[in-house]
Amino acid sequence: MPHQQILMLFGLLPVATNISTWWNFGSMLLTCSALQIMTGFFLSMHYTANINLAFSSIVHVVRDVPHGWMMQNLHAIGASMFFICVYIHVARGLYYGSYLNKETWLSGTTLLIMLMATAFFGYVLPWGQMSFWAATVITNLLTAIPYLGTTMTTWLWGGFAINDPTLTRFFALHFILPFGIISLSSLHIMLLHEEGSSNPLGTNSDIDKIPFHPYHTYKDLFMISSMIMIMLLTISFIPDIFNDPENFSEANPLVTPQHIKPEWYFLFAYGILRSIPNKLGGALALAMSIMILLTVPFTHTANTRSMTFRPFMQLMFWTLVATFMIITWTATKPVEPPYTMISQVTSSLYFMFFMSNPIVGWLENKIMKTQL
């Protein structure tokens, strides 16, 4: 709408008075992406995409480059902070019914897929033991695709095994994808401002709005400052909290780590993958764990938008949060009982939330009608 665009130019965009702190994570994500692009740019100046030099180039950045340790840690901790904010942002969208703004939700889910791909390519670049073996395990899943799988895997690797061409193309992809993320983020924000943000009540907030500036700008700045402070405290005192000890050893194709696992933010999807004993089934479940978010706007049957007044859905939502955490925890454990059974049960519960969403909505409508 032209009227809204003029208001945006002067920072007068009207926003609902009752939006809570959960609405601040969008601006925090923009800050994260800006930080990641800046630190990544400086790191790329010193990085060498060669299997014999990649690991040494990271060591060189940390030891010899002025403030290189800070750049490297900011980039690594920044990725974790990015995913913490993303998962909270998605959870808020699910809880408050923001997914009913279909275009914004679908562009956001596409952004999440692009972000996960970028993070995966980035995890391979240091060429440590876990980087190499995580890349081998995850890319090998393509071989599960009937007929085309082996050809696609060879094409992705640039050979018959993960080697120098693989690292070179992963670096190229890791460099180019963030620009796609920035472009899609712009589209995501434009689509959001076509309709405007929802609010915790899930009602139309046209009746009661305030200008975005100064109220929400200061609130955003406070949350961004808090996030940066947490990041700086983490890189100063516990910089390796999210790192795997195996990744401090250079990649060796002849030595397999005892327990192969990706970064913590992929563990829920990896846990779902591991819970299914069939390779193709596991690969499909892995893809569906993210793709199922695309179905949410089309399966909403409740008359109420937000979960604020939906106790049954609240129970299901917090069960989803608990299952997400339990799957993440089981993915860090060996593939043996009782962990396999726990991950199978929690994976089923994860998908059950999305499948039972329309049924619960329909039941709630029935209960509301009988009470009226």
Swiss-Prot record:
Heme b b566 binds at H89, H188. Pfam families: Cytochrom_B_C, Cytochrome_B. One of its GO terms (biological process) is mitochondrial electron transport, ubiquinol to cytochrome c. PROSITE patterns: CYTB_CTER, CYTB_NTER. The keyword S-adenosyl-L-methionine does not apply. Heme 1 (or BL or b562) is low-potential and absorbs at about 562 nm, and heme 2 (or BH or b566) is high-potential and absorbs at about 566 nm. This is Cytochrome b.
